[in-house]
Amino acid sequence: MAFQDLIIQIGSLGRFQILHMIFVLICHALSAPHTLLENFTAAIPSHRCWVPILDNDTASDNGSRILSQDDLLRISIPLDSNLRPDKCRRYIQPQWHLLHLNGTFPTVTEPDTEPCVDGWVYDQSTFLSTTVTQWDLVCGSQALNSVAKFIYMTGIFIGYIMGGHLSDKFGRKLIFTCSLLKMAITETCVAFAPSFLIYCSLRFLSGIFSSTLRTNSALLILEWTSPKFQALVMALIFIASGVGQTLLGGLAFAFRNWHHLQLALSVPMFLLLIPTRWLSESARWLIMANKPQKSLKELKKAACVNRIKNSGDALTLEVVKTIMKEELEAAQTKPSPLDLFRTPNLRKRICLLSFVRFVSVMSLLGLLINIQYLSNNVFLLQCLYGVVCIPANVLGNFSMNYMGRRMTQLIFMSVLGISILAVVFLPQEMQILRVFLSTLGGAISSASITSTLVHANELVPTIIRATALGVVGIAGSAGGALSPLLMILTTYSASLPWIIYGILPFLGGLVALLLPETKNQPLPDSIQDIENKRKSSKEAKKDVVAKVTPL
C-alpha cells in the first residue's frame, strides 16, 4: 500500500497528472467512436429488388413510361405482411391486372415471384453509401451484418486476452503506443477494403488494438493518482467517450459516404502518435517490474512538473526501496494469469467482476449499436447519447463518492434495465418518448460501466492488475461479441433481444452487492494484500462476536 505515500509526496493530482489525463482523454475521444462506427457505416437503408421496368431507363414496353412510379412498383414488387413493398422478392412478370381495382382481371393463383437476382435498389436519402449497399448485405445475407459486428467484438475479446498480459510484461507506455499506431493503420485501411472478407479481417485487428489501447490508457492515468481521485478519473474517461460519440454523430451527419466517414475518424489518430514521446511510464508498474531506478526517474519528473519543492531531493533510490520493500520482494516472482485463480478471495473477485462486466457490456452495446431500431433519426440519437454521458458520469462520480461503488452499480443497472424494457413495449408512434427512454438508458449505461470499471480497478492488485483487468475485460468482450448476435433472434420475435438486454442489468446489479466496498480504500499492490485483508476482516468479526457474547 506504500506507493500511495510516494504519490502524495509528488502530488496526487497536479499538472503532471492533468497533462497526462488530457492526452489520454483525447485518445479516448477519438478511439471510442470506432466501436459504434457501424451504426452508420453498416446502416441498412430501405431497399427493394431491381426491376427492369422501374430501373432501366430504356424500358418502354407496354407504355410503362406513362405510368407513375407507384403504379410501376405495384405491378413489379409484391407486398409483405405489413402491406409494404417486399424487400427481398419481385414478380417474375409485371402484374398489369393489379392496376385494375374493379376486379376485371381476377387472380386465381398467387403470381410467381423470385429473389432479387439482379440486385437491389437502395434509398439514398439518409446514407449515400454503406457497407450494406456496397456488398448487398440484405435479405439472405443480412445476418452477415451482425457477423461483422461480432468479428469486431471478437477482436476486442482477443485484445483483452493479449493486452493485459503484454502490458504487465512490457509496460503500459510501450503497449499503448504500439496499439495506437496499429489501430490508426488498420482503421484507415478499412476504408479501402476491396471485399467484405478483408473488411472483416481489418476490423478484427482493429478490435484487438482498440481494447489494448483503452486498457493501457486508463492504467496510465489511474496508476499516477491517489484512490480519492480514481472515481473522478474513470468518470472523465467515459465523458471523453461521450464526447467521441457526439463527434461521431456530427461527422456521420456530414459524411454520408461510409468511406469518407471511416477516414475522417481514422486519419487524425496518426497525429496522436506525436505526443507519445513525452508520455511517462507508470512508476507503479516500474516498481512492481523490479525497476526502481527507472521508477525513481519518473517520480522525480512528476514532482518537477507538479512544482513540488524539495520532493525531488527527498526522493532517493533508498527511500523508494524502503517504502516499497514488500512490493519489490513480491516482484521477484513474476505473476502469471493463473495466479488470479489460486487464492480464494482474488478468485471470487475475478469471477464476480467478470459476470458483472459481461451483463453490463452486453446490455450497453445492445442499446448503442442498434440505434437504427430505436429511432428514425439516428444522427440525433447518437449525439444525444454522447451529450447525456457527460451529466450522467458526473452524477455517477457523485454517487460513487457518497453511496459507494456497490450501491451505485445496483441503482444504475436497475434504471438501465427498466428503460430498455419500457422501450420494448412502447409503440413506434410514440417516437419522442422512445427517444427519451433510449437516451436515458444510454446515459445510465455509461455511468454504470464507469462504476464497474472503477470497482474492478480497486479490487485487483497492482502486480497483476493489467492481466486481471484483461481477464475481466474478456468477459465484457464476450458479452459485447454476443450482443449483436442476439439481434438475429428478431426473426422469431422482434422484442426478444430487447427483453434479454433489459433483464440482464438487474442480475448484474445484484451480483455487484456480493463484492467488497472500496470507497476511499487504498489500492492493493500484491495478491497477499487481498488475502491479508480477508483474514483481517475475519478476525475483526471474531472480535466483535467475542465482545457481544455474554460470559
Curated annotation (Swiss-Prot):
<dbReference type="GO" id="GO:0002238">
    <property type="term" value="P:response to molecule of fungal origin"/>
</dbReference>
<feature type="transmembrane region" description="Helical">
    <location>
        <begin position="146"/>
        <end position="166"/>
    </location>
</feature>
<feature type="transmembrane region" description="Helical">
    <location>
        <begin position="260"/>
        <end position="280"/>
    </location>
</feature>
<feature type="topological domain" description="Extracellular">
    <location>
        <begin position="210"/>
        <end position="234"/>
    </location>
</feature>
<feature type="glycosylation site" description="N-linked (GlcNAc...) asparagine">
    <location>
        <position position="39"/>
    </location>
</feature>
<dbReference type="GO" id="GO:0016324">
    <property type="term" value="C:apical plasma membrane"/>
</dbReference>
<dbReference type="GO" id="GO:0015711">
    <property type="term" value="P:organic anion transport"/>
</dbReference>
<keyword id="KW-1003">Cell membrane</keyword>
<comment type="function">
    <text>Sodium-independent organic anion transporter which shows high specificity for estrone sulfate, dehydroepiandrosterone sulfate, and the mycotoxin ochratoxin A (OTA). Transport of OTA is strongly inhibited by estrone sulfate and probenecid, and to a lesser extent by 2,4-dichlorophenoxyacetic acid (2,4-D) and salicylate. Transport of estrone sulfate is inhibited by various steroid sulfate conjugates including dehydroepiandrosterone sulfate, alpha-naphthyl sulfate, beta-estradiol sulfate, 4-methylumbelliferyl sulfate and p-nitrophenyl sulfate (but not minoxidil sulfate).</text>
</comment>
<feature type="topological domain" description="Extracellular">
    <location>
        <begin position="281"/>
        <end position="349"/>
    </location>
</feature>
<dbReference type="InterPro" id="IPR020846">
    <property type="entry name" value="MFS_dom"/>
</dbReference>
<keyword id="KW-1133">Transmembrane helix</keyword>
<feature type="topological domain" description="Extracellular">
    <location>
        <begin position="399"/>
        <end position="406"/>
    </location>
</feature>
<feature type="topological domain" description="Extracellular">
    <location>
        <begin position="27"/>
        <end position="145"/>
    </location>
</feature>
<keyword id="KW-0813">Transport</keyword>
<feature type="transmembrane region" description="Helical">
    <location>
        <begin position="435"/>
        <end position="455"/>
    </location>
</feature>
<feature type="topological domain" description="Extracellular">
    <location>
        <begin position="456"/>
        <end position="468"/>
    </location>
</feature>
<feature type="topological domain" description="Cytoplasmic">
    <location>
        <begin position="428"/>
        <end position="434"/>
    </location>
</feature>
<feature type="region of interest" description="Disordered">
    <location>
        <begin position="524"/>
        <end position="551"/>
    </location>
</feature>
<dbReference type="Pfam" id="PF00083">
    <property type="entry name" value="Sugar_tr"/>
</dbReference>
<dbReference type="InterPro" id="IPR036259">
    <property type="entry name" value="MFS_trans_sf"/>
</dbReference>
<feature type="transmembrane region" description="Helical">
    <location>
        <begin position="469"/>
        <end position="489"/>
    </location>
</feature>
<feature type="transmembrane region" description="Helical">
    <location>
        <begin position="407"/>
        <end position="427"/>
    </location>
</feature>
<feature type="glycosylation site" description="N-linked (GlcNAc...) asparagine">
    <location>
        <position position="56"/>
    </location>
</feature>
<protein>
    <recommendedName>
        <fullName>Solute carrier family 22 member 19</fullName>
    </recommendedName>
</protein>
<feature type="topological domain" description="Cytoplasmic">
    <location>
        <begin position="490"/>
        <end position="495"/>
    </location>
</feature>
<feature type="transmembrane region" description="Helical">
    <location>
        <begin position="6"/>
        <end position="26"/>
    </location>
</feature>
<feature type="glycosylation site" description="N-linked (GlcNAc...) asparagine">
    <location>
        <position position="102"/>
    </location>
</feature>
<comment type="similarity">
    <text>Belongs to the major facilitator (TC 2.A.1) superfamily. Organic cation transporter (TC 2.A.1.19) family.</text>
</comment>
<feature type="transmembrane region" description="Helical">
    <location>
        <begin position="496"/>
        <end position="516"/>
    </location>
</feature>
<keyword id="KW-0472">Membrane</keyword>
<dbReference type="GO" id="GO:0019534">
    <property type="term" value="F:toxin transmembrane transporter activity"/>
</dbReference>
<keyword id="KW-0812">Transmembrane</keyword>
<feature type="topological domain" description="Cytoplasmic">
    <location>
        <begin position="1"/>
        <end position="5"/>
    </location>
</feature>
<feature type="glycosylation site" description="N-linked (GlcNAc...) asparagine">
    <location>
        <position position="62"/>
    </location>
</feature>
<keyword id="KW-0325">Glycoprotein</keyword>
<dbReference type="InterPro" id="IPR005828">
    <property type="entry name" value="MFS_sugar_transport-like"/>
</dbReference>
<feature type="transmembrane region" description="Helical">
    <location>
        <begin position="378"/>
        <end position="398"/>
    </location>
</feature>
<feature type="transmembrane region" description="Helical">
    <location>
        <begin position="235"/>
        <end position="255"/>
    </location>
</feature>
<feature type="topological domain" description="Cytoplasmic">
    <location>
        <begin position="167"/>
        <end position="188"/>
    </location>
</feature>
<feature type="transmembrane region" description="Helical">
    <location>
        <begin position="350"/>
        <end position="370"/>
    </location>
</feature>
<dbReference type="GO" id="GO:0008514">
    <property type="term" value="F:organic anion transmembrane transporter activity"/>
</dbReference>
